[in-house]
Regions:
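Acidic/polar low-complexity segments with low predicted structural confidence
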Residues: 102, 109-319, 465, 473-481
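Loop/turn elements at helix/coil->beta-strand transitions in domains of secreted/extracellular proteins
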Residues: 353-355, 412, 441-445
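Von Willebrand factor
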Residues: 315-373, 379-419, 424-426, 447-456
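N-terminal targeting peptides and non-cytosolic leader segments immediately upstream
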Residues: 43, 51-110
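Charged, amphipathic alpha-helical stretches
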Residues: 1-64
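Acidic, Ser/Thr-rich peripheral helices and adjacent loops at domain boundaries
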Residues: 371-389, 465-473
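VWA/integrin I-like adhesion module and closely mimicked acidic/polar interface patches used
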Residues: 389, 422-470, 480
Length: 482
């Protein structure tokens, strides 16, 4: 992709934008949509990216006359207050600048279409520019395919005339744009900033773990192409956007549940020396707060010689997989995005505990997804977001799948979470076999009943049964304590 610029771009900038452009289906689609409206739109996209990515982007004083409209648009973009503030997040950031380019380009294209609709003179000039651009391309193609020297001079004259007419048309477009509504343009740019930040936030919610602030770190582990692809699906797939919002909420709850669980599992079994603030004895804190003993405390603290509680957590060996059996019968459709956000939160716990995670979707049939050590690829997230089985409810099939997952693991102490809003029949022989394997492999089953009262069947195979209105009910959050 070759582009001309009105900014102080260099060969690295142009090469890097070409790489980003080739990774982004959204930018490619936007390029195809924008070029028929404004012939220099592909060049404009490159400049929008450079203005977001470069440390010190500047608009050049002297530019080709055919880029006059681009210069006017870039002046409008870069003068906007929301744009300047946004650059704090996009400078030298490949992902943010790529997402920002798509959003700013989209809003600019929409704004141009609106101005063209309102301004008859602008519409005429842009139509003229489009015709001239098309004629210029045809003339250049004809020149490359015809080696007749006698006609070469005529073609060059015709090309020069077309280029001159194109310059005049683009200059007129720039003048008309200068008189167009700047308030609507500023509003469009502010929307682009907001939408870009929201998309990146949703991306971190999906990819992040349950550790506070882990979203950015987890994001960096994914190749840029994968980051861009998932971000673009979030911005175009409403279901994935909702799933990301629920995942972010549930991961925060899971973080608190896991922290509380860890604190409860730690015994203060004596006194030792060290410098961990949260474990210091009250006496040491008193010495820190008293002027006469503060210096001595700080010296001993720096040397790791302050007295603190000795804590011994329960020793944790390898644990079996975490298995989520998730009802996807037709009645669960309304809670689908909640359910998948819930699944992503459990998956992040498995990742933290370095446990395999299996998601068994069930209705009349089952579909099993396995994620070793709780790790999931961006494309797998999209597949999961788009999957919904529908149909009736059968319990034996997902439970049979859960047994397979548990029995294949070399570790005991698996956790099975069974979620349903329905009821099903289980024959006695299956229940006996399931419970026998459960005892042998040492795993537990927690069942969540959503909006139903019937618990007789799930009690046959569950260690604990909880009733909840939906996944956002506090009773459902008990699952995050596993």
């Amino acid at each position: 992709m070759k582009n001309k610029s009105v900014l102080n771009t260099d060969s690295f900038d142009k090469r890097r934008f070409t790489e980003i452009f080739n990774m982004s289906k959204q930018l490619q689609g936007l390029n195809e949509a924008g070029e028929p409206r404004l012939p220099t739109f592909p060049d404009l996209l490159g400049d929008i990216w450079a203005s977001l990515y470069k440390m010190k982007p500047e608009i050049k004083e002297e530019i080709p006359e055919t880029l006059t409209a681009n210069k006017r648009l870039m002046e409008n973009i870069m003068a906007d207050e929301s744009f300047q503030n946004f650059r704090e997040f996009t400078r030298l950031d490949d992902l943010s600048s790529a997402l920002g380019t798509a959003k700013f380009g989209e809003k600019t294209n929409d704004w141009l279409a609106e101005q063209e609709r309102k301004n008859e003179e602008l519409r005429k000039q842009m139509e003229e520019a489009r015709k001239l651009h098309q004629q210029l391309q045809q003339q250049q193609e004809k020149a490359s395919g015809d080696g007749d020297d006698g006609a070469e001079g005529q073609r060059q004259d015709a090309e020069q005339n077309l280029q001159q007419a194109m310059k005049q048309a683009m200059e007129q477009i720039a003048r008309e744009l200068q008189q167009s509504g700047q308030s609507s343009f500023s509003q469009a740019m502010a929307e682009a900033v907001k939408e870009t930040q929201k998309t990146k936030g949703d991306l971190k919610s999906l990819l992040g773990g349950i550790t506070a602030g882990s979203g950015e770190a987890e994001l960096k582990k994914v190749p840029l192409r994968g980051q861009i692809a998932l971000a673009e699906r979030i911005s175009t797939l409403p279901e994935l956007k909702e799933i990301a919002e629920w995942a972010g909420r549930f991961k925060q709850i899971a973080r608190k549940k896991q922290r509380s669980k860890h604190e409860d599992s730690v015994d203060r079994s004596g006194i030792t020396l060290g410098n961990q603030v949260e474990r210091l004895l009250p006496m040491e804190l008193g010495m820190y707060s008293h002027p006469a003993t503060k210096a001595d405390f700080l010296r001993r603290f720096a040397e790791g010689q302050t007295m603190q509680y000795e804590q011994k957590g329960k020793e944790t060996l390898g644990k079996g997989p975490m298995v989520l059996c998730l009802d996807q019968s037709s009645s669960m459709r309304a809670m689908d995005t909640q359910a998948k956000g819930f699944a992503f939160a459990l998956m992040s716990i498995a990742r933290k505990q370095k446990r395999d995670f299996a998601l068994i979707l069930f209705s009349r049939r089952t579909r099993t997804f396995r994620y070793p050590k709780g790790k999931i690829l961006p494309e797998e997230m999209v597949t999961l977001a788009e999957t919904f089985l529908g149909g009736g409810t059968y319990f034996d099939r997902p439970l049979e799948e859960a047994l397979k997952v548990v029995e294949e693991s070399r570790f005991k102490k698996a956790d099975v979470i069974f979620v349903t809003d329905g009821e099903s029949y289980l024959n006695e022989s299956f229940v006996e076999r399931f419970n026998s394997t459960k005892q042998k492999k040492g795993f537990q089953v927690l069942s969540l009943l959503l909006g139903v009262e019937e618990r007789e069947t799930v009690e046959l195979f569950s260690d604990e049964v909880l009733k909840a209105k939906d996944f956002d009910d506090e009773s459902s959050h008990v699952a995050f304590g596993i």
